[in-house]
């Protein structure tokens, strides 16, 4: 079947297949849209085209080695994926990162949020027809990716956080450059709003479109801007603070009507808050270590089955994660979640005491939000479906896993 193939199911309704290679689905998402006339009466999402078995693959990886798999969930926000996974393992192992590492992780988390929201704004605006914003947003996102490159040498799949801290420290001149860029970023966000927020066409395409009531948003499991756009105050950075968020002052933007326009405004306002958080992290960042003394080293080669001696490992001579079936991790299970750019990203890990996860389950916000598409699109036109999908900010890498 092609990108858009029409199947007649009765004299009054027809089914239009959208995707899995349609540019507006932002990935390999297929939607079977049933119409009566020009109005949507039902949508059936069809996922799985990007399934790579991340959760099963993690069972054959060591805890540090599974980091590269988390990079490739929401590949737009690899930094927050890494941090979410590290926090889960740290809580399981009882490791506390040093204060400087916490501030660094909070700072790069918010830079990732900015990068993610910029890409969302660019593609969402392009879907609706605002070409200029697409170009402007990519200009700023490129700056943020260049900062990531200066910090750790990678732009997209960074693998920068570590269990117990971060991989390398950030040089002072890089922190100064980031601080100056944040001042510029506030001006840029004002420019985006000048082009869109009061634009008559933008308002006509987004206001009153894809409305979801607060109680329905909660029942569907929406999180992040998709939930806060309906006026529900839920932000893990506030409710269950992690890293340095408890020491940072910021507000949580909320919508009122729960439509596409409110979800747009929430993300725009979040970008301003992220700028303020980054600046506070730089101002308050303490000196000191960036990695806990209890942090595990990366795995030995697979053929190695010996105990690591003192001096061989960053883990002070403890038995690191080798292929020997020895109890080197606490047995048990844990669920740990963070506020990723798209919503609640959670990791459920079961430990059997070995150096590898017995089971890892990822709670990806994009997968949950796809399930809300039928509810949001019911009664709307096909053009509105494009706007609604864009406002949910779906990435299929984490949805299919």
From Swiss-Prot:
One GO MF term: NADH:ubiquinone reductase (non-electrogenic) activity
Family as reported in the entry's similarity comment: Belongs to the complex I 49 kDa subunit family.
Pfam family, one: Complex1_49kDa
InterPro entries xref list: NADH_Q_OxRdtase_suD, NADH_UbQ_OxRdtase_49kDa_CS, NDH1_su_D/H, NiFe-Hase_large
Keywords: Cell inner membrane, Cell membrane, Membrane, NAD, Quinone, Translocase, Transport, Ubiquinone
Source organism of this protein record: Thermodesulfovibrio yellowstonii (strain ATCC 51303 / DSM 11347 / YP87)
Name of the protein: NADH-quinone oxidoreductase subunit D 2
Predominant place of localization: membrane
Membrane topology annotation: Peripheral membrane protein
Catalysed reactions, semicolon-separated: a quinone + NADH + 5 H(+)(in) = a quinol + NAD(+) + 4 H(+)(out)
Quaternary structure and partners: NDH-1 is composed of 14 different subunits. Subunits NuoB, C, D, E, F, and G constitute the peripheral sector of the complex.
DNA repair recorded as keyword: no
Entry's EC annotation: 7.1.1.-
A GO-annotated cellular component: plasma membrane
Broad enzyme group: translocase
Task performed by this protein: NDH-1 shuttles electrons from NADH, via FMN and iron-sulfur (Fe-S) centers, to quinones in the respiratory chain. The immediate electron acceptor for the enzyme in this species is believed to be ubiquinone. Couples the redox reaction to proton translocation (for every two electrons transferred, four hydrogen ions are translocated across the cytoplasmic membrane), and thus conserves the redox energy in a proton gradient.
Intracellular or extracellular location(s): Cell inner membrane
